Amino acid sequence: MTIELKPGGLLIAIEGIDGAGKTTLARRLATTLDAAGARVVLSKEPTNGPWGTQLRQSAATGRLSAEEEAELLIRDRHEHVDTLIAPALARGDIVILDRYFPSMVAYQGAAGLPLDELLERNAFAPRPDVLLLLDLPPPTGLARIRARGDAPNHFETQDNLERCRTIFAALDLPGKHVVDASADADSVLRQAHAIIVAALADRLSGDAHTDTGKAALELLSGGRPA
């Protein structure tokens, strides 16, 4: 059974400081929802496009100013929205993003740019229907980064991650859910999966109370997290 959503789909953004487990959760959610019959598009920011590639290179060197990084992020996001996010939502797909504009607000805000201006510059970007904020103490995130063999970049200092965590917590956006990312990966997945199934109830192409809608919800909620 293919699970059909209404036009507009469902936009899920997974956010949090470095080391919180965003990429792992995004991939496992995509696998779980796909196995249940949903059409899923998995993407990330920065993207692999020219602006995103330049940003990742700068993260290793720290040579760009916060304003220069913000400008590249906006260019990257415009392209991402136009070429992938908006078309997928129009088809009624579930779009899962490993980072989105809240990361720009948190990280560039932690670098000193005004939060209200950062939000205003992202007004063009579709707002997530579900914003999963993976909350984690920075020392734990840094320990995870080192455990996987990576050297922390210039963003990944405890002081900077503390500032980012504070901004993430203060963001007042619809659809925001805080998930304890210090729990094991399976527990985090179960929490996130339950939140998404609840959000999907009114997005199904068949009403959730019809036989088709009930069957779709049963598949989604009964699908074992991968």
From Swiss-Prot:
Cellular component annotations (GO), alphabetically ordered: cytosol
Enzyme Commission numbers on file: 2.7.4.9
GO annotation (BP), single: dUDP biosynthetic process
Keyword annotations: ATP-binding, Kinase, Nucleotide biosynthesis, Nucleotide-binding, Transferase
Top-rank EC class of the record's enzyme: transferase
UniProt cross-references to Pfam families, sorted A to Z: Thymidylate_kin
Gene Ontology terms for molecular function: ATP binding; dTMP kinase activity
Binding site for ATP: 16-23
Catalytic activity: dTMP + ATP = dTDP + ADP
PANTHER family per record: THYMIDYLATE KINASE, UMP-CMP KINASE 2, MITOCHONDRIAL
Function (record text): Phosphorylation of dTMP to form dTDP in both de novo and salvage pathways of dTTP synthesis.
Sequence similarity: Belongs to the thymidylate kinase family.
Protein name per UniProt: Thymidylate kinase
Species for this entry: Xanthomonas euvesicatoria pv. vesicatoria (strain 85-10)
